[in-house]
Amino acid sequence: MSSSVEYRIVTTWERKEDIETRSKTNRQDKNSLYVRTFEVEGNLWFVSSDITRHFNSLIPINECWNSISDHMMTIHTTTAGHFFEKVVDYYGLCALINFEEDPKRKELLEFVNNIHTNNLINVATPELVKVYMTDEEKKVFI
């Protein structure tokens, strides 16, 4: 990967049982979802591991928080001329995928796959967890 690109994980959350499942099988089952937010050279990216659509899809986001309810949020953003609508709940991110090539997409996928392969789980908390979870729900997450 290019050393000129800086990556910083902003937030991550997963269900404990998903981490245990993945460490045993080295795969994600269809119910195993997580979301990460990355800051790459000042731009925010969401990453999803919903294997029923595509493994570790990356979607850039720009001021795209449209609606927030107690446990759900819809995100709208446009990338490479494509419109995306994503629903986030406290189980993670389900994303529609843009399969078009992007110069940084390959680097980002390699970076995320490296994190996944080596089980380098950076768990953050802050705002996203605070928005989506009750105290009881937080107990099933790391």
Locate each region found by the language model.
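Major-groove recognition helix of helix-turn-helix-like DNA-binding domains
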Residues: I61-H71
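Positively charged, aromatic-accented nucleic-acid-binding surfaces
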Residues: M1-L58, T79-I142
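Short, charged amphipathic alpha-helical segments flanked by flexible coils
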Residues: S69-T79
